[in-house]
From Swiss-Prot:
This is Chaperone protein DnaJ. SUPFAM superfamilies: Chaperone J-domain, DnaJ/Hsp40 cysteine-rich domain, HSP40/DnaJ peptide-binding domain. It comes from Streptococcus mutans serotype c (strain ATCC 700610 / UA159). Its cofactor is Zn(2+). Participates actively in the response to hyperosmotic and heat shock by preventing the aggregation of stress-denatured proteins and by disaggregating proteins, also in an autonomous, DnaK-independent fashion. Unfolded proteins bind initially to DnaJ; upon interaction with the DnaJ-bound protein, DnaK hydrolyzes its bound ATP, resulting in the formation of a stable complex. GrpE releases ADP from DnaK; ATP binding to DnaK triggers the release of the substrate protein, thus completing the reaction cycle. Residues 5-69 form the J domain. Zn(2+) 2 binds at C163, C166, C189, C192.
Length: 377
């Protein structure tokens, strides 16, 4: 076995954080838990996951594993003589010895309360909903505390008992013959699966897990000014905890749908509109849509294509509460594609009055004239 296999068992990279390792362990152990997964090989897979987490979940063991592989994580190297090192089985383990002298220990209490897993939910918002804020009711399934046994995993009227194999420690000693000699290591108890307790009579609803899948709904207040990718954390709306631990959190991920009128970057809203060349040349007052309603915009004479105007305060709210953004309006001067004789003559007169050389457009052939005639029908 190389020093990558434990990471592969949990589905994480070698540079994963302890939080990522813990979440991966919870997800994988739940998937292959023998009380839930009855497929052949599930129990063996569960044991492999437990073995990997026993090492990677401990910083010191993980460091030794990364450097020396499993032999380093499981207690060091022998001299080849078969000597297995100090047998701590009669003393409750090194952690218990240090705990009795110094009031602490490095081992994890298998019965300690643990927070449940976090969940994610993606919610779609209309453009205006993201600008002004809204309230959404989201529906999803989550692992909740079993309503029959209240999360104990035991049949009502019964209680879990101390594991008969590990005596409540959650781990057992295992001797392994290696090329370096006999080695003793601690592994997760295969009877209680690390909880330190046995359930003699499992709950008929959750089959001993203490959890059941339930439909859940919660109302989410979306603040004004949110953008795609931002998250809203709802504490305690995730999955049920373990050993009486609190529920995890729900992270609502925002996805803002595109508008057929506007574009947005932060608190600034962008809008493009067409004006004709007469408006551009002589100036005009036009009506412009905004998310706050229509407003009038003065187009000065001589406006060119690409000119951008700012409508102050007509953008989106700034999420941190610092007022409103602006709306930028970019104009596109549209050149007419078809002119009648009067319009052509007027433009020719304009060209002469402006000192512009006479325009001599290419005369149309017979087929182009026929095509124009059909277009006008």
């Amino acid at each position: 076995m190389n020093n990558q296999e434990y990471y592969d068992r949990l589905g994480v990279s070698k540079d994963a954080s302890q939080d990522e390792i813990k979440k991966a362990y919870r997800r994988m152990s739940k998937k292959y838990h023998p009380d839930i997964n009855k497929e052949p090989g599930a129990e063996e897979k569960y044991k492999e996951i437990q073995e990997a987490y026993d090492t990677l979940g401990d910083e010191q063991k993980r460091a030794a594993y990364d450097q020396y592989g499993p032999a380093g994580a499981n207690g060091g190297f022998g001299d080849g003589s078969g000597f297995s090192g100090f047998d701590s089985s009669g003393f409750g383990g090194f952690e218990d010895i240090f705990s009795s002298f110094f009031g602490g220990g490095a081992s994890r209490n298998p019965n300690a309360p643990r927070q449940g897993d976090d969940l994610q939910y993606r919610v779609n918002l209309q453009f205006e909903e993201a600008v002004f804020g809204t309230e959404k009711e989201v529906h999803y399934n989550r692992e909740a505390s079993c309503h029959t046994c209240n999360g104990s995993g035991a049949k009502p009227g019964t209680s879990p008992v101390t594991c008969s194999k590990c005596h409540g420690s959650g781990v057992i000693n295992m001797d392994t013959q290696t090329p370096l000699g006999m080695m003793r290591r601690q592994v997760t108890c295969d009877v209680c699966h690390g909880t330190g307790q046995e359930i003699k009579e499992p709950c008929p609803t959750c089959h001993g897990t203490g959890h059941e899948k339930q439909s859940h709904k919660v109302s989410v207040k979306i603040p004004a000014g949110v953008e795609t990718g931002q998250q809203i954390r709802l504490a305690g709306q995730g999955e049920a905890g373990f050993n009486g631990g609190p529920y995890g959190d729900l992270f609502v991920i925002i996805n803002v749908l595109k508008s057929d009128k506007f574009e947005r970057d932060g608190s600034t809203i962008y809008y493009s509109m067409d004006i004709n060349f007469v408006q551009a040349a002589l100036g005009d007052t036009v009506e412009v849509p905004t998310v706050h309603g229509n407003v009038e915009l003065a187009i000065p004479a001589g406006t060119q294509t690409g000119k951008t105007f700012r409508l102050k305060g007509k953008g989106a709210p700034r999420l941190r509460g610092n007022g409103q953004g602006d709306q930028h309006v970019t104009v596109n001067v549209v050149t007419p594609t078809k002119l009648n004789d009067a319009q052509k003559e007027a433009l020719q007169d304009f060209a002469k009055a402006s000192g512009i050389n006479p325009v001599h457009p290419k005369k149309k052939g017979f087929f182009n004239k026929v095509k124009d005639a059909f277009d006008e029908m």
